[in-house]
């Protein structure tokens, strides 16, 4: 219905321009909003206020002129001017009720649009280092990315979901040496675990697997491991220097193949666990992209060479630098260190070169908020490589903070003291976790209230929405139990009987669903859908409590059941996009 109003206003503008009452070269975006108060109609526009300055006329005068030339339309009952020049539209009941017929006809397809026009979009998200289980902070990025992908698909985009596996960096070496040291401990060596090693129980479990499969072939005396190494942090040394030294010692003692054995076993075990965890969370990736593959297929060299060819690099103190400041970054960035090793930034350059090389029209990176420093450098690299910077969106997601018993739970992967995503799912369920994670804007801090997530009350939004769906299903079951009839055709022919305020409100709400999807997609804000579904559920509960739904008057009863089924379908469609189930009973 909003599209009808926008069309009528556009025609009114053309009429005024053709009559010479308005400049012909106006470039005005027509915005139509849902009326917040039913007394002000169904839709409202501030078009007259927007036109006031360029037309040099009072908003109210412009509103009167617009209303006078708006074409008549059978769906519009009346148009009123309010306040300083707002134009309010009141729709006929017949126009509102047409949406019910559309929903019942389209079913699961209702709300899907063509905003994206099949543009290819790559969304990269989660991409947590495969050095331990996913924690509750990662869960928010997972839920947000998956839901955004669903929203964009519903809006007509061709979406690919990708996880970037950081399998070639220093953190993986730290995990590998952590596993090896626990392996030595199982062999009876009196190891002292490094301050900067990974300490979780999963490290012991991987070490146990290595011990069971490999026996003692990789055992070396502890004295040979730590001989002549610098001091660790507890002894007054630097933990970063110490862990790098012990990695180098492990590589020397085990050899390339031996160290790779621990590296690959740890990587596979942790990555398989991450995949299983996300699968159980309803988050499914189309692609798992290996950082190591960038080295193996020459992408790192290609990305660096592309910057060289464009004159965006220089050498200083034996290192190769990217002229990032030429593109707005605060400082230039190292691509290749003086020792010949490429940096993480070089991998980022190559990865984004690869993304565009695969033909995506739009790239969306979803990072944790702690990666805010990466945003500018990634965008400068994309621009320097000759790609359209506006085709790259970087969305920062604040980590969720979990509270239990009023106390904040601290999380650190290396210390091993963290609450995993799996533990959260087991405690509150997938549905609550998926909804709570996307109920706020991604940049907003989130305090995850476990008690609220588990409560069966109207204060718990996901329970409230699911209960609305279950209530409708219950009404349909009662229909059969009471031997009453629902003639859908009769209901559709008598939708004009739906005149109660609760009914017109519900009809207006379900009519908004396609607009919510398009808006959420355009702004990359899935929380709009979460808010909307709660509003729709509230409308349904109010209706359920105020009206006798299974009334004796057959025509009215059938019309109301058509409305109920439409609401149920919209709830079902919206919950599916959020990754939340729609139970038929609760």
UniProtKB/Swiss-Prot annotation:
UniProt-recorded name of the protein: Arginine--tRNA ligase
Cited InterPro entries: aa-tRNA-synth_I_CS (IPR001412), Arg-tRNA-ligase (IPR001278), Arg-tRNA-synth_N (IPR005148), Arg-tRNA-synth_N_sf (IPR036695), ArgRS_core (IPR035684), DALR_anticod-bd (IPR008909), Rossmann-like_a/b/a_fold (IPR014729), tRNAsynth_Ia_anticodon-bd (IPR009080)
Native source organism of the sequence: Legionella pneumophila (strain Corby)
GO biological process: one example: arginyl-tRNA aminoacylation
CDD domains in UniProt: ArgRS_core (cd00671)
Database matches in SUPFAM superfamilies: Anticodon-binding domain of a subclass of class I aminoacyl-tRNA synthetases, Arginyl-tRNA synthetase (ArgRS), N-terminal 'additional' domain, Nucleotidylyl transferase
Gene3D superfamilies per UniProt: Arginyl tRNA synthetase N-terminal domain, HUPs, Isoleucyl-tRNA Synthetase, Domain 1
Catalytic activity from the UniProt record: tRNA(Arg) + L-arginine + ATP = L-arginyl-tRNA(Arg) + AMP + diphosphate
GO CC, alphabetical: cytoplasm
Key words of the record: Aminoacyl-tRNA synthetase, ATP-binding, Cytoplasm, Ligase, Nucleotide-binding, Protein biosynthesis
Taxonomic path: Bacteria, Pseudomonadati, Pseudomonadota, Gammaproteobacteria, Legionellales
Gene Ontology terms, MF aspect: arginine-tRNA ligase activity; ATP binding
The protein's assembly and partners: Monomer.
Residue ranges of the motif 'HIGH' region: 128-138
PROSITE patterns, A to Z: AA_TRNA_LIGASE_I
């Amino acid at each position: 219905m909003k599209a009808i109003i926008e069309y009528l206003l556009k025609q009114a503008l053309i009429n005024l321009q053709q009559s010479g009452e308005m400049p012909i070269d106006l470039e005005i975006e027509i915005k139509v909003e849902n009326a917040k108060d039913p007394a002000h109609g169904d839709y409202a526009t501030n078009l007259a206020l927007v036109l006031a300055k360029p037309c040099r006329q009072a908003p109210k005068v412009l509103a009167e002129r617009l209303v006078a030339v708006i074409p008549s339309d059978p769906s519009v009952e009346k148009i009123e001017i309010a306040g300083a020049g707002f134009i309010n539209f009141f729709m006929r009941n017949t126009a509102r009720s047409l949406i019910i017929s559309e929903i019942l006809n389209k079913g699961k397809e209702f709300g899907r649009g063509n905003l994206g026009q099949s543009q290819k979009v790559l969304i990269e998200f989660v991409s947590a280092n495969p050095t331990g289980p996913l924690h509750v902070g990662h869960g928010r990025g997972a839920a947000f990315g998956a839901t955004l992908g669903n929203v964009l698909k519903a809006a007509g985009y061709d979406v690919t979901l990708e996880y970037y596996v950081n399998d070639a960096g220093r953190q993986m070496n730290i995990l590998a040496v952590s596993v090896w040291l626990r392996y030595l401990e199982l062999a009876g060596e009196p190891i002292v675990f490094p301050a900067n090693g990974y300490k979780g129980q999963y490290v012991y479990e991987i070490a146990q697997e290595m011990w069971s499969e490999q026996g003692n072939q990789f055992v070396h005396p502890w004295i040979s491991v730590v001989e002549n190494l610098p001091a660790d942090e507890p002894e007054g040394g630097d933990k970063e220097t110490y862990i790098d030294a012990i990695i180098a010692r492990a590589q020397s003692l085990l050899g390339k193949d031996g160290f790779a054995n621990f590296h690959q076993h740890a990587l596979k075990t942790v990555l398989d666990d991450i995949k299983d965890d996300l699968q159980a969370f309803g988050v499914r990736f189309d692609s798992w992209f290996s950082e190591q593959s960038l080295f193996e297929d020459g992408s790192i060299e290609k990305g660096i060479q592309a910057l060289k060819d464009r004159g965006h690099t220089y050498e200083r103190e034996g290192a190769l630098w990217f002229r990032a400041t030429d593109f707005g970054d605060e400082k230039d960035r190292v691509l290749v260190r003086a020792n010949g090793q490429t940096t993480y930034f070089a991998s980022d350059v190559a990865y984004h070169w690869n993304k565009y090389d695969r033909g995506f029209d739009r790239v969306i990176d979803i990072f944790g908020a702690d990666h805010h420093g990466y945003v500018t450098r990634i965008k400068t690299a994309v621009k320097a490589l000759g790609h359209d910077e506006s085709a790259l969106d970087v969305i920062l997601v604040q980590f969720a903070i979990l509270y239990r018993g009023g106390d904040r739970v601290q999380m650190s992967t290396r210390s091993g003291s963290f609450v995993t995503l799996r533990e959260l799912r087991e405690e509150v369920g997938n549905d609550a976790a998926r909804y709570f994670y996307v109920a706020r804007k991604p940049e907003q801090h989130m305090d995850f209230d476990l008690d609220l997530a588990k409560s069966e009350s109207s204060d718990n939004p996901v329970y409230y929405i699911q209960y609305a769906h279950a209530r409708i299903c219950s009404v349909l079951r009662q229909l059969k139990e009471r031997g009453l009839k629902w003639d859908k055709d009769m209901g559709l022919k008598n939708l004009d009987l739906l005149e109660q305020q609760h009914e017109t409100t519900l009809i207006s709400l379900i009519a908004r669903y396609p607009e919510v999807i398009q808006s959420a997609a355009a702004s990359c804000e899935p929380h709009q859908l979460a808010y909307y579904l709660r509003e729709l559920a509230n409308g349904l509960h109010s209706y359920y409590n105020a009206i006798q739904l299974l009334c004796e008057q057959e025509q009215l009863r059938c019309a109301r059941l058509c409305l109920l089924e439409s609401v149920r379908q919209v709830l079902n469609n919206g919950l599916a996009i959020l990754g939340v189930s729609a139970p038929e009973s609760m």
